[in-house]
């Protein structure tokens, strides 16, 4: 939230930075036209997992402080548009996206709060670069830390996760007891998963290595990668 706001603030020093110019689309990358908008969204990830010092300052505080301002604006808009009357014709939720990208894998979560009781600021993937850190923060800050706060995180766009959305790749060196604790925590915080959105279906995939049985003829619907694309069997 902080980076994007600063990149659109014309009188801020970050406005003319390379990463902000890429993000706004002022510069074009040497990729095909349909990929330009995607590369804009990925511009901050292109420059690494850490916050850009050119945009956020040496300690990242510019982006964190700005994110708090934007988060408050979002909360006001959420409350303004929510129908608090008995008619309940329109419902809004306080929410944000935890936009983690690791090794070119999309590990995004939509973080949705149950009520207007929310943390002071959203936790960025720049400050918590593993899903386990997000779960721990949501549990400590919201669920266990405030009786009036409740939240869930919805994994989305897992069709771009290279399978890492469902593989506990950061837990391999942990004790069995700790792995069980994290699995239970995830089950509590992530009871849902997104199946479909504009960037394709995430429910299933034909052509996965070592799968027993014939391809599912209903599994080629709205795939990000065309069903005709040959997938190498890395089994």
What is the role of each PLM region?
Residues 1-235:
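Extended, charged catalytic domains and RNA/DNA-binding interfaces, predominantly
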